[in-house]
Curated annotation (Swiss-Prot):
Lineage per the UniProt record: Bacteria, Pseudomonadati, Pseudomonadota, Gammaproteobacteria, Enterobacterales
Gene behind this protein: eutK
Descriptive protein name: Bacterial microcompartment shell protein EutK
Keyword Zinc-finger: no
Annotated EutK-Ctail domain residues: 109-165
Pathway this chain belongs to: Amine and polyamine degradation; ethanolamine degradation
Keyword Isomerase: no
Species per Swiss-Prot/TrEMBL record: Escherichia coli (strain K12)
């Protein structure tokens, strides 16, 4: 369980690195994660006890203002479990989705047709585009794409599925 969180949003990578260094040196905190929001805008998340998070954020703000701009800062004492999950999501470790055991397995012919289609579309396709092309329900298209993605045949970027380069 996390005792307290400190969040610092800054403009500029140099300001973020400077702020993170100052926060870690100023107090007994641990850098939990960072998130690049827009080009040049970063959020740093530290954890520790509440007083340490406050001291770290004070030092981080001072350092970031020397080299960039501080957008916002926030200390959260005893964060709720859902808030912890959100921070864990920032850390690229989301909760594992529960797979439905009765998810239909695509047949080989459908998989071959889908792979042939994805070979011809260089920029990849979304589940909605696949569903419209084959006349499938959206859930069937999503399941087919996810099965091929799980098998390592496809790669996924945002909502687009593409063939993996060989």
């Amino acid at each position: 369980m996390i005792n307290a969180l400190g969040l610092l949003e800054v403009d500029g990578m140099v300001a973020a690195i400077d702020a993170a260094d100052a926060m870690l040196k100023a107090a007994n905190v641990r850098l939990l994660s960072h998130e690049v929001l827009d080009p040049g805008r970063l959020t740093l998340v530290v954890e520790g006890d509440l007083a340490a998070c406050r001291a770290a954020l004070d030092a981080g703000c001072a350092a970031a203002m020397r080299t960039g701009r501080v957008i916002s800062r926030k200390e959260i004492g005893r964060p709720d479990d859902d808030t912890q999950w959100l921070v864990t999501g920032f850390n690229r470790q989301p909760k594992q989705p529960v797979r439905e055991p009765d998810a239909p397995v695509i047949v080989a012919e459908s998989a071959d047709e889908l792979l042939a289609l994805l070979t011809s579309v260089r920029q990849g396709m979304t589940a909605g585009e696949v569903a419209a092309h084959f006349g499938w329900p959206l859930e069937k298209a999503r399941n087919a794409l996810e099965q091929l993605f799980s098998a390592g045949t496809l790669r996924k970027r945002s909502s687009r599925y593409r063939l993996k380069p060989h």
